[in-house]
């Protein structure tokens, strides 16, 4: 299977676009680390059906991301935040409370 972390992030971004069953299966597999057999048993279906659903949903999530580009936007925001924090940390004259406040506000912007 693909990069688990990447798919997990795509589930976070686009999970609401999946059906309830698709979302549940993807969450069980990628976030809860259940095996195909365990998920098949829970859903009263075959291991192959779960495998096919996961592959299909992975492609679907990648397709959403190619169109909406949320992961690239979030990555860019984190890079900008890190650059800003590095510049702030170079300036030792700034109060630590101010640095912490700026860091928190940047985090809010990223997660908005």
UniProtKB/Swiss-Prot annotation:
Organism annotation: Clostridium perfringens (strain SM101 / Type A)
Alphabetical list of NCBIfam families matching this protein: PRK00118.2-2 (NF001072), YlxM (NF045758)
Protein's job: Might take part in the signal recognition particle (SRP) pathway. This is inferred from the conservation of its genetic proximity to ftsY/ffh. May be a regulatory protein.
Highest taxon of source: Bacteria
Pfam families, alphabetized: UPF0122
Protein name according to UniProt: UPF0122 protein CPR_1686
Family: Belongs to the UPF0122 family.
Signal peptide from the UniProt entry: none
